[in-house]
């Protein structure tokens, strides 16, 4: 952008399963492979395709769109303005705004009219006119998949250029179970939500159905361009390879993790000084 005057990477976030077998394997416990040759548990466990081990594939991905109404024109308008998000499979919903928002919000968040009137939605750029006391304020909200696992934490990922090098920093901004990010490390406490690998059961009383907060960048420099996007993590749950192993009485693979944390990502907001 400094050299050409525009940003060719100003994209919205989308995701998909990249499946070639006419199935929609969005659930880890219902994964049926992607390309036909990995249609059985045996082939998924030890097979490969184009020099990639089948066991390394993620089960799925979904695209989400924040449209004003459920019509074809409204959906395409939302995609053009990049008010979209991506998930690793579950129907988690997430949204991100930047603007003149109050210091704190309830977990149910702010009204849509307030969000749009006092700020800009994900996928857009924001300038100094939206700063409060020379600080950028972001509102982020997420709600769990109603048939999925509870949420563990909300994060903001910040990126900026410094001395010609791209820098990134991850901030935990909202934590589950009444905890809060550490003021120095900006990290939530480690999740205590356990997964029983003998049957893939999880602790249902851990985590939140929704998370929301207004966050202010503690290292904000109003003269420095930056991007921000939100990420939300579910509590840990079994990966599809673990489900295959349990159903076939196989040992767990040591080349992939037994559990994962499903997640969703918002489109970025770009700060332009």
PLM regions with names:
Residues 1-273:
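C-terminal functional module detector
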């Amino acid at each position: 952008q400094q050299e050409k005057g525009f940003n060719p990477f100003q994209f919205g976030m989308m995701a998909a399963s990249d499946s070639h077998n006419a199935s929609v394997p969005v659930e880890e416990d219902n994964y049926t492979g992607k390309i036909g040759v990995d249609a059985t548990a045996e082939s998924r466990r030890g097979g490969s395709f184009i020099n990639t081990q089948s066991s390394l594939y993620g089960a799925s991905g979904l695209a989400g769109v924040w449209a004003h109404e459920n019509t074809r024109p409204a959906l395409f308008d939302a995609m053009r303005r990049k008010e979209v998000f991506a998930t690793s499979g579950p129907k988690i919903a997430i949204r991100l705004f930047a603007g003149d928002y109050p210091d704190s919000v309830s977990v149910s968040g702010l009204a849509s009219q307030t969000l749009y009137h006092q700020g800009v939605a994900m996928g857009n750029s924001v300038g100094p006119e939206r700063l409060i006391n020379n600080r950028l304020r972001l509102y982020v909200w997420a709600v769990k998949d109603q048939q999925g696992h509870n949420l563990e934490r909300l994060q903001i990922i910040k990126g900026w250029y410094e001395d010609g090098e791209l820098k990134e920093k991850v901030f935990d901004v909202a934590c589950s179970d009444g905890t809060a990010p550490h003021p120095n490390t900006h990290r939530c406490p480690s999740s205590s939500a356990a997964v029983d690998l003998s049957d893939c059961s999880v602790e249902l009383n851990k985590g939140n159905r929704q998370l929301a907060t207004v966050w202010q960048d503690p290292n904000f420099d109003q003269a420095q361009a930056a991007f921000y996007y939100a990420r939300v993590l579910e509590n840990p749950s079994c990966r599809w390879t673990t489900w295959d192993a349990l159903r076939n009485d196989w040992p767990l693979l040591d080349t992939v993790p037994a559990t994962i944390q499903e997640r969703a990502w918002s489109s970025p907001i770009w700060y332009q000084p």
